[in-house]
Regions:
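Active-site/acyl-donor-binding loops of N-acyltransferases
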Residues: 1-10, 134-167
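A conserved beta-strand-loop-helix scaffold within acyl/acetyltransferase catalytic domains
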Residues: 3-112, 152-153
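Residue-level preference for non-acidic, small/hydrophobic
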Residues: 43, 120-123, 150
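Active-site scaffold segments
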Residues: 93, 118-121, 138
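Glycine-rich phosphate/pyrophosphate-binding loops
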Residues: 98-102, 132-137
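Conserved acetyl-CoA-binding loop-helix of GNAT-fold acetyltransferases
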Residues: 112-124
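Conserved acyl-CoA
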Residues: 121-133
């Protein structure tokens, strides 16, 4: 089921505020996607750590570059830095009234920082500043732990029978 966050009603929970505080030493910048070997190396490290059995682990540099740079829509990357060193990123699409989070990757040695959630929270902050109405998070699959985190964002809506419903 597809999911989205209606941003006008979104409130940062205690846990989300804690994650933001825990990562307040990180800087972020939004840029147009441009691949390089540093990003690719971090991406491959992330895949090896988080998704070692997934289809993307065999992704070549050319495929990675295509994912980042070739899109029929306006795609951007939210970059994370610590002490001017690249730390992680979220690839997302920009539409008139919504953002769509596509893929995140980050340095896996910092898993206790909840960087996947942190990247979503930073994108929510940015979207709210830009008066964006929705953030689409992709599919929710209850049985898949790596995709079930999406219901932690409240309110959340799911697409059911071609209609968006609160979940």
């Amino acid at each position: 089921m597809s999911t989205r966050i209606p941003l006008s009603n979104f409130l940062f929970s205690k846990n989300f505020k804690r994650i933001l505080r825990k990562n307040d030493d990180l800087e972020f910048k939004i840029v147009k996607p441009k691949s390089n070997r540093t990003y690719y190396k971090l991406f491959k490290n992330y895949l090896k750590f988080r998704h070692s059995k997934g289809d993307m682990t065999d992704m070549s540099y050319l495929d990675f570059r295509t994912m980042l740079e070739i899109s029929p829509v306006n795609t951007k990357i939210l970059h994370l830095y610590k002490n001017n060193k690249f730390f992680g990123a979220m690839l997302y699409d920009v539409y008139e009234k919504s953002y769509s989070a596509n893929y995140s990757f980050y340095n896996p040695i910092f898993k206790k920082r909840s960087l996947g959630t942190f990247l979503i929270l930073k994108l929510i902050e940015e979207a709210k500043k830009e008066k964006i109405k929705y953030l689409y998070l992709g599919y929710y699959i209850k049985e898949c732990k790596k995709m079930s985190y999406k219901i932690n964002f409240k309110p959340i809506e799911i697409l059911k029978n071609k209609k968006w419903e609160s979940f």
